[in-house]
Amino acid sequence: MSESDTVAGEASPVRKIIHIDMDAFYASVEQRDNPDLRGKPVAVGGSAERGVVAAASYEARQFGVRSAMPSVTAKRQCPDLVFVKPRFEVYKAISRQIRDIFAEHTPIVEPLSLDEAYLDVTENLQGIPLARDIALKIRERIKAETGLNASAGISYNKFLAKLASDHRKPNGQFVISPEMGPAFVETLPVGKFHGIGPATGAKMNALGMFTGLDIRRQTLEFMNANFGKSGAYYYWISRGVDERPVRANRVRKSIGAETTFSSDLTEFDALVLELKPLVDKVWRHCEATGSRGRTVTLKIKFADFEIITRSRSALSPIAGRDDLERLACGLLEVEMPLPKSVRLLGVSLSSLQAGNDAEPPQLTLAI
């Protein structure tokens, strides 16, 4: 699609929406961190006797194990199922890492959960000409930095982007163009529509609606009369139309990066070498989001897992990458010599505000 492409009946350029969905997120994290779990059916959640499944690996899903299923039922369906207690702080940390990757491409990100988000890349901060290439680059970065797989859907609205990400799971991506949208929806069973639950689906079936095409054959008045305020939504999505914007409604409080060393470090020069790429990453995120901050925080985790943080605030927002590095290195230097070897080093920037730089170029991207 070119810059002049429009959806029929609309004057504005086609939006470029990406839906990113991590594949079996909680379970994949556990399999990543525990090699003994790889290739085995895994359920993250409570005990096999009294709990509920929070997430299931793809190996477990082959036996019909699903999230929100009672653990007793899951164990009955998959006798070899391995239960793992959830580690939500770990999942949250990885989710923040993934969102930092998103922020390098667009500030318009709507998180749906720790493992799922919409991105509006109609205006692309990196100037990549195709939205599908943005999705691929994001997925490759997620894999490289976290060791986890993500699926992506690319389309011109949120409803279709989410359908597209489901279409090539796991570890794939799919594009639904404006030309494909209506035909893609018309063959879809109503139970596959996001936003149509079992009760609504059963009601639609009772009214003779089994696919998107069946919904499309109804009038708006009929849908409103039978489904209230949701009727109009069902009416329009059956036509591939979804006007909902991607809402970036979460105010970012800080931008940070950290790394865990393969072997513990103690020398100042070695730590500075590790600090420099972290500063680079934080500053890239600042550039991507148009943010500037005043407070630099250094995080040090020692080999015995004790954590200390040290902060310093500037009188005005830090203007450049070198200034950020100077302040971060200064915080580290004050702590030398360190009492113990260091396992992890992190740097973050807070007291954020919008930058004074010129607005990034507005690019209408082809899907």
Pin down the residues of each PLM region.
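Gly/Gly-Pro- and Ser/Thr-rich, intrinsically disordered tail segments characteristic of DNA damage-repair
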Residues: M1-N226, A232, L349, Q353-D357, ...
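DNA-contacting surface of Y-family translesion DNA polymerases
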Residues: E10-S12, H19, K192, T200-V342, ...
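Short Gly/Ser/Thr- and Asp/Glu-enriched loop/turn motifs at secondary-structure junctions
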Residues: L112-E116, S155-K158, S291-T295, K340-L344
